[in-house]
Amino acid sequence: MFISFEGTEGVGKTTLIRKIHQHFEEQGKQVVLTREPGGTPLAEQIRSILLAVNHDENMSHDTELLLIYAARAQHLQQVILPALVSNKIVLSDRFTDASFAYQCSGRGLSQEKLQLLNQNFVSRMPEVTFWLDAPIELGMNRARERGALDRFEQEKLSFFTKVREGYETLWKSEPERIKRLDATQSPEQVFEQALQYLG
């Protein structure tokens, strides 16, 4: 089983992933915990480039998208697909839905570019995607409390409003796969809500 976790900054994805990871391990199941961008040594290097705040040069939106997909291709081939072949459960902090929300809805890139990349480089989609939804201000306050903000976290409120709208669009278009979780609840309540969808 392949499960991805989506949402804007500070909505509690990491906490939920840990809880679900523990839940499956207690059932004796083998679980692979991973993230995007990242998940392999090479993809983590790309992640560092993507998140770094560079005051000397602004990264173009196309460059950002292509770097994310370079990391994703490596991640799929080296981690996700081998784990699924071995009947392991894969829990990924973000996947392709993040690219639609951040790069298409947030940055304004065309959906055609994303579709082309997905058709060529994404051979497997999650069975379940949890979208943790909370007011943007709440998530950003949580992100600031964690310390120094990365390149994405430093974006304006208007950007994250568009990102959230992107996630909402996906949720409405694929309700069978994408499950919206109310991330204003306590971590335990969010976890219990997620378990209902996992049976």
List where the protein language model places each region.
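Conserved lysine of the Walker
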Residues: 13
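ATP-dependent small-molecule kinase phosphotransfer cores
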Residues: 29-122
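Hydrophobic anchor at the beta1->P-loop junction of P-loop NTPases
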Residues: 3-5
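Conserved phosphoryl-transfer catalytic core
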Residues: 21, 25-29
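Walker A (P-loop) phosphate-binding loop of P-loop NTPases
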Residues: 10
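A glycine- and Lys/Arg-enriched "phosphate-lid" helix/loop adjacent to the NTP-binding pocket
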Residues: 94-165
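Hydrophobic positions on the alpha1 helix immediately C-terminal to the Walker A/P-loop
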Residues: 16
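NTP-dependent small-molecule kinase module
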Residues: 19-21, 137-199
